[in-house]
Amino acid sequence: MKTYSAKPSEIEKKWWVIDAKNIVLGRLASRVANMLRGKHKPSFTPHLDCGDNIIIINAEHVKLTGKKANPKDGKIYYRYTGFPGGIKDTTAGKILSGKHPERVIKMAVKRMITRNALGAKQMSNLYVYANGDHPHMAQQPTVYDFASQNPKNKK
């Protein structure tokens, strides 16, 4: 029996909507990364984009455990401007209370996806919204109840 390898024409993508209200960030990000890659499907093929499309709503209400949410000495995100001495930092608490709180989820998932062209394609299937509204009702997404899978998922 040969090992099954899916062809691009055989891949079926589903649409999922996940409510991130009071959900722990790391647990949510790791599950979403697996769903974007398609590792939850029996037809998973590593070199193809066989993952699903994920819509995350209420991203501003995601929870961080421990001291990571502390605005002063919490989890720090670094970026580099390209100039000498140009390293900038911000905390997860500042991002969540700022203008674009959905970036915390996008960064967490992006760092769990492979860093190549396939990973960029898979990240384009992730849609994160700060509030409860999303413009993807025409795709008829299925509600994915992440909070009830494990009591540790909710805080």
Swiss-Prot record:
Keywords in alphabetical order: Ribonucleoprotein, Ribosomal protein
Record's keyword annotation contains Ribonucleoprotein: yes
InterPro entries assigned to the protein according to its UniProt record, in alphabetical order: Ribosomal_uL13, Ribosomal_uL13_bac-type, Ribosomal_uL13_CS, Ribosomal_uL13_sf
CDD domains listed in its UniProt record: Ribosomal_L13
GO molecular function, one term: structural constituent of ribosome
BP terms from Gene Ontology: negative regulation of translation; translation
GO (cellular component) term, any one: cytosolic large ribosomal subunit
Keyword Ribosomal protein: yes
Source organism, top-level taxon: Bacteria
Family of the protein in this entry: Belongs to the universal ribosomal protein uL13 family.
HAMAP family in the cross-refs: Ribosomal_uL13
Task performed by this protein: This protein is one of the early assembly proteins of the 50S ribosomal subunit, although it is not seen to bind rRNA by itself. It is important during the early stages of 50S assembly.
Subunit (UniProt): Part of the 50S ribosomal subunit.
UniProt-recorded name of the protein: Large ribosomal subunit protein uL13
Species the sequence originates in: Rickettsia peacockii (strain Rustic)
Lineage, uppermost ranks: Bacteria, Pseudomonadati, Pseudomonadota, Alphaproteobacteria, Rickettsiales
Encoding gene (name): rplM
